[in-house]
Amino acid sequence: MEVEVVRSGGLAGLRLTWTVEVEDQPDPEEWVLLVERLPWSDTPPAPPEPDRYTYRIRCEPHVATLAERQVTGPWRDLVDRVRDVAEPSRRRADVGGRAAPAQPGAPDAEGPRTTAPSDPTPAPPAPGD
Amino acid sequence: MPQPPVPRESRVRAGIVPPYLLLRIAAAEEHYDVAADAARRSLLRDEPMRELRVEGAHPGLLPHEHTRSATTGRDHDVEAEGEGAPVDAAVPEPAPDRRISDAQGAESLPGHLVRTEGQPATGDVAVDQAYDGLGEVWALFERVYGRDAIDGEGAPLEATVHFGDHYDNAFWDGERMVFGDGDGEVFRGFTQSISVIGHELAHGVTEMTARLRYRDQSGALNEHVSDVFGALTEQYAMGQDAEAATWLIGEGIFTELVQGRALRSMLEPGTAYDDDVLGRDPQPAHFRDYIVTDADNGGVHLNSGIPNRAFALAAVELGGFAWEHVGRIWYDALTGGTLRPNDGFAVFAAATLAAARERYGDVSREVAAVANGWRAVGVEPE
Ligand SMILES: [Zn+2]
C-alpha cells in the first residue's frame, strides 16, 4: 500500500511529492488504521485562497484534494506523518510531458487530456472561449 | 532530473545546511539587500520625490489625487474633471492604516497585534518589513491610481507575520496577507521582497474588483495581476523606469544556497532560477506552451508567465515609468467592470486594449505597445 501526498500551489508554485510505502514502515498496521479512518468521501471543494497550498492525497482506491485549511484532524496527522518519514521529491510530472498547448484562434487544436479519471477538473478554455 | 535528497533535519530545523549545498554557497552577496533596503525607505521621506516624478510624466495624476475626497470617493474616473483643479488644502491627505500581527510560529490567524499605524519600528525585522512594504503598496495604489487601500475606502491593511514553523509561503486568506519565515534553506522570510508584499495585497484588490476565479486561465490572470502590481510597487518605491527594472517577483526570497534570482521573471518567464534542488523555473513565456495541469489550481503560478511577459514587453516598448502607462491601463481593465470571473487570456487582452484606447486614443503608442505585447506571447485579443 502506497500513500502519496502532493503539495502544489503556494506563492512560488513549487510542487512537492512525498511517497510512503506502508509495508516498509515499522508500524504498517497503524498506517492502515490511519488511512481507513480518513473521511475520504467527506471533502467538499473549498474556495481556493490565493497562494495557499493545495494537497492531493492518494491511497488507492482513494484520492482526495484538499485546500490547506482543510488539512486538519486526521488529515493533518497523516500529512505530518508522511512528511516525517519521507523525503519530498520535486518531480514535475505535469511540466513538459503533459502540456497540451492550445492554439489561439484554433480551440480544437487542444489535445486530449491525459488526466486520471478521478480528476473532475475541466481543461482550461482555449483563449477563443 | 536527478533528485538530490533534502536531509530531513535541515528541512525541519533551519540552520543545518546539507553538504551538497555548502559546496556552492555563493561568495557573491548579490544585490538583493541593496534593492530591498532601498525600497524600504520610509514612506514619508519618499513622498516629495514621488509626487514630482508622477507630476512630471503624467500631468493628470497630481490634480486627480487631490480631487479625491469624501465626495469623489474612490472613483478613478474622476481624473478628467480633476485636471488642473486647484488643490484643496482642507481635504486631509489620505494615509494608510496598517495593522501587523504576529502568529508567533503558530498556524493560527490573526495572531497578536504588534504594530499599528504610526507606531515606531518594533525591531522585529519581519514586522517592520511588512509594515514598510504595505506602506509602499498603499502608496502605489493611492497616489498613482487613486485607490485608498484594498477596498478603495481606506480599510485597514492587515498582515500577519511569523506564520507557522519555518513556513515556506505567503498567501492572501481573503482578509489579510500572511507571511511565513521560510525554512532558511530554500526560502528566507517572505517579507524580504516588496514585490511579494505587493503581490499579496493585489490579490485583495482583484477580489474586490474583477474577482477573477482562481483556477485555470482566469486564475493565471489573477496571479498575473498580482505580479503586475507587485513589480510596480517595487519599481515605484525605487523610482525605476521599465528599462532599469528587474521585472523579477520575489527577488531576495531565495537563500544564497539557491541558484536563482527570484521566484519569477515577468520579462523572461522560465529564467528566474535553475537549481539542483528546485529544478528550472517552469513558467511558459508563450501561449503555445500553456501548461495543462490539475495541480496548483490549474497551473495558475505557471501560466501567469504568459500575460506577465505581454505586460513587461509593452512596458519596455513604451519606456519610462511602467506604473504611469501600462500599469494604469491594467488598473483600468481590472477595475473597469467589464471583466467577468471566468474570463481567460483573450478576453483580458481585449480589456487591456479597450482600456488603452479609452485612455490614450485609438492611434497611440500605448495601444500599439499593448497589442504588440499580446501578439508576442501568442494571445489574440477577442
Ligand atoms: Zn498569488
Language model segments and positions:
Chain B
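Zymogen propeptides/activation segments of proteases
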Residues: 1-195, 207-382
